[in-house]
Every structure is written in C-alpha cells, then in structure tokens.
Amino acid sequence: MSDTLDLAQELIRRRSVTPEDAGCQQLIAERLAPLGFEAHHLRFEDVDNLWLRRGSEGPVLAFAGHTDVVPTGPVEKWSSDPFQPQIRNGQLYGRGAADMKSSIAAFVIACEAFLKDHPDHKGSIALLITSDEEGPSVNGTVKVVEWLEARGEKITWALVGEPSSTERLGDVIKNGRRGSLSGVLRVRGQQGHVAYPHLADNPVHRALPALAELAAIQWDEGNEHFPPTSFQISNIHAGTGAENVIPGELEVMFNLRFSTEQTDEGIRTRVHAVLDAHGLDYELSWRLSGHPFLTAEGELVEAASAAIREVMGLDTELSTAGGTSDGRFIAPTGAQVVELGPLNASIHKIDEHVRIEDLDALSRIYTGILKRLLVE
C-alpha cells in the first residue's frame, strides 16, 4: 500500500461536510511539521483554514485545496459507508476521494519526496487549505488571500488540486475559469382572479418577452480560450399554487458564465436595459461569484505539462470549461494558477471514487512540478 493511499484514506475517514474540517487540517499540519513547514491555523466564523509555508523567500509555489466535501446524499444508495474508505476493483471509494482529498494527500507525499532530495530548494513551498470551498466560499480562500496580502506575502504559482482530468490522469488541466454572475429578479404585478384579468396585472405575462429576449442574446462569440458567454434561467416561481389566481409577483433566478470578452458591469447594464425597455416594475439583486481569469502559457503551465508528459506519457489539454474554483480568489493577486487533479467523472455522486494507480502517479506529477519550479 502506498503512502498516498494511506493518507487519502485517513482524510476520507474524517466527516468533513462543509463547513466542517473534522481534524483534516491538523493532520496535514502535523504531517508536514517535521519538514519545516510553519503552520497558521486561521478560523473565520465557522470555517477552518490552514496556511503552511516552508521558506521565507520567493518565488512561492502554493498548493490550494479544500478539506470540506459535499453531503453524501442517501447513504443507503452507496455501496459502502462513504466515510469508511473502501478499495474495490482498483478504485478507492469514499466521499472526497476525487474531490479532493486524494489531491491533498498526493501533494503532501510529493513534498516529502521532493524535500528528501532537495532540502535546500530555492523559494518557498506553501499549502492553502480551507473547509469552505463547497459552500458559500466567503470565509475560506478569499479570507486567507486577504490575510496574506495584509502580511505582504505573495503567491507566485498556485497549483489547485481540483479534479481536472476526464479520461486519463493529466489529460486536462484548467488554466482559467469563466466568471460567474447570478441574479434574482422580482417582477411586481397585481394579484387577481383569472376570470377578471382586466382587474389584475399578470407579472408572468409581462416578464416573459423580456426573459425571452435575454435568453436569445448572443453576448459574444468567446475567444481562443473561452466559449461564448452563457445566460441560463435556473428557477422561476410565481403564484399561490391555486389555478384560479393571477400571481402578484414573479421571481426569476438566473446565472451568466462569462468570458474575458465581458465585464460584470457591462452585463448588468445590458440586463437592466432590456428589463427597462419592457416597462417592468421590478427589483434585481446581483451576486458576483468570481471574475474570469486566464493563466497564459508560462512557467507553471509549462512545468505542469512537462511533469504530466514525464509521468503519464501524454500531452495535456488546456481548458477553461466547467464551473468556478477557489483559483478565482488567487488569480487577481497576479499569481499564475492552474488546476490539476484526478478524474472528475464521479465527483459529488453516489459512490465517488478515484483510481488507486492514479494516486501515486499524481504525487509524482506534483513532485515533478516542484522540481521544475524550485530546482531547475
């Protein structure tokens, strides 16, 4: 059994459903303390965060990850207890196996291997670990980044351990992410009887043309790194539940995933212009989850690509597809950011799992990145 597998199982046994850490960060800190990592345990409200650093000089290579996991769903539908890791058919099963306790284990073991051969490496190695990535993400990485900035500490390269691979380990790495902007629209009308529509004002009827116009907009054509901006309505609610009552208010929830071709300010302005043009009586609240970011090909992308080629014998694909990650909080500091981790096919699902053979391979890839950035 490998050290990476052992540590991954130890982490999975801890029931760290967001925002709980369940002792994972303490385990990581204790494991790395003998190697010279200085630990800062940072608690913001109900969220545990950990900043570990070895070295005081730049450049700084930081691994960013999260110990929290999503809820299991119906436990009876799992083939085994989601918090009792099981090995079956060459796979490690358990909540967090792919997202992303195996990545954390792989980087810890990579640090041990790297420092055994290169105790006098240049720069610094760091880990930024939070228990608030799967939840609101307001007291996790973003707060640690603010804390680092206040201390004058700067990350040069951020290696985010999110499960980026699709068919084979390392076949895809994320070198950017789209921005995410959500809106909650409330359109006011006047409630009334469906038989007397002239005595009421149906907000559904009023809003539908505007919503159709928003859904039909071609916001942009994307670019070589990003797909076109997407507008999606996720929820619509109106009425009392009775079939003979015209509703007095309509609530619509929507989201835009936008590329570097757009700004959140520009999107907001255009949405308001459409709603105003249709004469709606409305209020609209916004929530920006993150701006789009892109790490162009440079030291980090090159180091990751070369390490994958060395260990896996394949050329990786750069991608910005998918949802957001905590990389969105680190990129604005000027750091180069890539996401590299195991296969993502089972994340958040019943019977989440990861290939056992990929665990040590991922650790060797991480070791290769450390060597290329802090030795060569």
Curated annotation (Swiss-Prot):
Query: GO biological process: any one?
Result: L-arginine biosynthetic process
Q: Where does Zn(2+) 2 bind?
A: 99, 134, 348
Gene3D superfamilies (alphabetical): Zn peptidases (3.40.630.10)
Keyword rRNA-binding carried by entry: no
Identify the catalytic residues.
Answer: 68, 133
Q: How is the cofactor bound?
A: Binds 2 Zn(2+) or Co(2+) ions per subunit.
Any Pfam family hit: Peptidase_M20
Kindly list the positions annotated as binding Zn(2+) 1.
66, 99, 162
Tell me yes or no: is Metal-binding among this UniProt entry's keywords: yes
Q: Where is the signal peptide?
A: none
Specify the pathway: Amino-acid biosynthesis; L-lysine biosynthesis via DAP pathway; LL-2,6-diaminopimelate from (S)-tetrahydrodipicolinate (succinylase route): step 3/3
Description of how the protein assembles with itself and partners = Homodimer.
Q: Which NCBIfam families match?
A: dapE_proteo, PRK13009.1
Protein's recorded name: Succinyl-diaminopimelate desuccinylase
Organism, as annotated: Thioalkalivibrio sulfidiphilus (strain HL-EbGR7)
